[in-house]
Regions:
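Acidic/charged, solvent-exposed loop-and-adjacent secondary-structure segments enriched in E/D, K/R, S/T
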Residues: 99-127
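A short, amphipathic edge element
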Residues: 27-28, 127-139, 189-194
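Generic beta-strand structural signal
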Residues: 66-67, 88-90, 97, 140, ...
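Bacterial N-terminal signal peptides that target proteins for export
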Residues: 1-10
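Gly/Pro-enriched, hydrophobic low-complexity segments
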Residues: 103, 107, 127, 147-245
Length: 250
């Protein structure tokens, strides 16, 4: 215990020159840097979501095409019972297609609060994927050492209406400029969800996490949901036809 405290104190001492050098960096600069790492002109990726239930876990593999923050198309690849399921986001509209029923359903209203495939993520979480700087104003609460790495602690408060999370607290790695963990709060101050990320790699000039963990804090004994990026490419040219509603049935 004492050795760990000494190590943390030593790291903080080493960090002081770095923090002084960064004193002109504003919290908005931090948000811009995070957004620059997490968002791109376009993304194409293959990934899997591991949903941990109380008794067992299941893995869903899918491939996604994303342009900016307004267009996304996802096709589920496995397991067999989920294969062929598709999801399309176009601006503020979201549709899903199930090959079992051969139906296209628009997800809206209260349905947006529903879980995606039994995971700890809701459809509204997906719809609110946009740059943090556009949604929140931030204040710097301090600096913490986590896993021997320096993190800026930011409090984010909503500056637009209608967000699921009125407040967020983020621990931003000082080198990666990524929110390595977050706590998401309701307007009442109640903790609703928590997230973390790891497996950070340099991909096409940006630091990017290859594993995300989401936990619904309102679910008793929640074991969380993992989202693992197997392969990702940024800034590819994706034709508009990829985001056609007609493609859901093909």
């Amino acid at each position: 215990m004492k050795i760990n405290n000494i190590i943390r104190a030593f790291i903080l001492c080493l960090a002081i020159p770095l923090l002084i050098a960064e004193e002109n960096i504003t919290v908005d600069d931090l948000l811009k840097a995070m957004d620059a790492n997490l968002y791109a002109k376009s993304q194409v990726y293959t990934s899997k979501m591991i949903v941990h239930g109380r008794r067992s876990s299941r893995t869903i593999e899918f491939r996604s095409w994303v342009v900016g923050i307004d267009k996304a198309f996802t096709e589920y690849l496995s397991p067999p019972r989920e294969a062929g399921t598709k999801m399309l986001k176009n601006d503020d509209k979201l549709w899903t297609y199930s090959p079992q029923t051969d139906r296209v359903i628009q997800i809206s209203g209260h349905m947006l609060r529903q879980s995606v495939m039994g995971s700890d993520m809701s459809y509204k979480d997906m719809m609110e994927e946009q740059p943090l700087l556009e949604m929140y104003k931030a204040t710097l609460e301090g600096t913490e050492i986590i896993n021997n790495r320096i993190h800026h602690v930011l409090l984010l408060e909503a500056k637009i209406t209608g967000l699921s999370y009125q407040k967020r607290r983020a621990w931003v790695d000082a080198e990666y400029l990524l929110p390595m963990k977050e706590e998401l709060y309701a307007k009442s101050g109640k903790l609703i969800k928590s997230t973390s990320m790891d497996g950070v790699k340099k991909i096409q000039g940006r630091w990017f996490p290859t594993r995300f963990i989401f936990r619904d804090e309102l679910k008793r004994n929640s074991r969380g949901t993992e989202w693992i990026i197997d392969e990702i490419q940024f800034d590819l040219d994706i034709p508009d036809s990829r985001f056609s509603k007609a493609l859901l049935r093909k």
